[in-house]
Amino acid sequence: MDGMRTGTKTRSLKKYEATSEAGGHDRGDPPLALFSPFGPLIAQAEVPPDFVGRINSYADKRVRADASSEFLLPEDVVFDGGERSLMRQTENLIRRYLRLTDEPTAAKIRVDVFWVVSQYAGTSSPVHFHSGDVSGVLYLKVPQLDRENEELQKTYISGRQAGYINFLIGGKQRFSKSLVSFKPRVGDFYIFPGWLLHGAEPFRGVGERRSLAFNAYVDVA
């Protein structure tokens, strides 16, 4: 009987959640998958392993094995790699992102800060927004989930604990989706408006969920 109630509840809640399928693509380097399930544009790029590895080589020395933590990235890590550095690649993605919106051409992009978030089982990032014009999240490590199939039968609203990132806007409105969720994958780099509400749900499992985030400001021509 409980199982029937849970299944019915999950089906009824599903109608408020958009699918995580890309609505379009930009074929630059790296390619961008584009998501606009409820108005604001979400772009997702897949960066190469060596790009992730450069950041992880620094982060591995800073994370705690027994507790969640956050720390800023220093300039030498941010600019390591020249034109293939974290800073240059992030600026490039932001410029391409802006061209795909209705914003004028960016005259100047200023990335204010990069930071790393390290989290373990049971830890969430409550829904929040950022202070910049454009923000992003890059996944550096993902955990091994327990009872993954069971968790994926649920939604964010019904208490899923699979570590997904969730983007939300508005509330319950007719003819409109309210949220979209993405499963973290190493190398996935999401770009989105800094004001867009988002959060990471907790997960059950072994290992670390590690991500990089940034805030950037844009001056238009």
Q: Model-derived features: where do they sit?
A:
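Ligand-binding loop in jelly-roll beta-barrel domains
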Residues: A200-S211
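Histidine-centered metal-chelating micro-motifs
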Residues: T123-S124, W195-G199
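Catalytic core of non-heme Fe(II) oxygenases with the double-stranded beta-helix
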Residues: V113-I191, E208
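Double-stranded beta-helix
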Residues: N215-A221
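Beta-strand secondary-structure signal
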Residues: Q44, S135-V137, S211-A213
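Non-heme Fe(II)/2-oxoglutarate
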Residues: R5-T105, V113-S125
